[in-house]
């Protein structure tokens, strides 16, 4: 009798545990935003008007001229072939806020659904989303984009989405991604970053080939003119479907964005000082210290400014091949680190622009 009762009690306890686990796994969350962890607070509520760091009344107009190193022979950025130039015409299902660690809000998607175990995610698309030719963006486009990138896209897509079992159309504006395993908390957010491409546009075009035909997109900009390998001019789409979304309010203010291509960074610096481009983000300490001592800076015509930020900057250091006997001893590696004269290098080679790396997560 005691043995039977013990087994019955154990069976009941296991049943309750399994039922509790299944209930927790099947519990569905939904909302206008999604975070890495469901316990994280969302800064912007369902009816927010704009991101705090943007000016919703920012004036629109004008243009900017930028410089890029290299060249281009294609606008198909989704394959390995060719040297493609990106455009502002492709959108994703979600967009991230810049003042939260990893919280996403809907762009093409209006809302999301996901279980506690994150074994799948559903995106409910905005019915007003449109391609530049006026055709609605639908679940067919999302499913086709995923399947095509997995089958014909650059190899990186197959690796990036390798944990996804399938993309499934649930309705005209509703799509679900099923995952091979539960528990990957980032995967639903990753799928929101899927570039959404127009199925009808590619129906009679070869996705695996390079092309200089300006692509059809749904985003705030489209290509106005270009010269292969030389420059691209993008224009703001006046009737862009998403211009009044809260996530876009205060953004996409320029009428035109021109990008000129140069042989190297030195050529871009010369173009900036000559007034041929408007902006450059400098990443070389020597150039920052020495290359901008020009009259235009002294007169205030060219502004040189260091912009504080709180973004992790990564780390720099020595990487040792510990398969070699000489580097297997931790004390040897530590001694080589001490032997490196950081202060002299920083003063002599880097114009005093660097600080010591104290963490893998600097800044």
What do these predicted ranges mean?
Residues 2-11:
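Bacterial N-terminal signal peptides that target proteins for export
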Residues 11-20:
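Bacterial N-terminal signal peptides
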Residues 27-117, 124, 147, 214-216:
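N-terminal lobe/hinge region of extracytoplasmic solute-binding protein
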Residues 33-35, 61-70, 110, 120-122, ...:
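Short, well-ordered beta-strand elements
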Residues 43, 49, 71, 88-102, ...:
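Gly/Pro-rich hinge or "lid" segments in bacterial periplasmic/extracellular proteins
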Residues 54-59, 79-84, 111-155, 170, ...:
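Aromatic- and charge-enriched surface segment that lines or borders ligand/interaction sites
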Residues 124, 158-203, 220-227:
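Surface-exposed binding/hinge segments that line
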Residues 166-169, 224-235, 260-324, 335, ...:
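Extracellular/periplasmic solute-recognition and catalytic clefts
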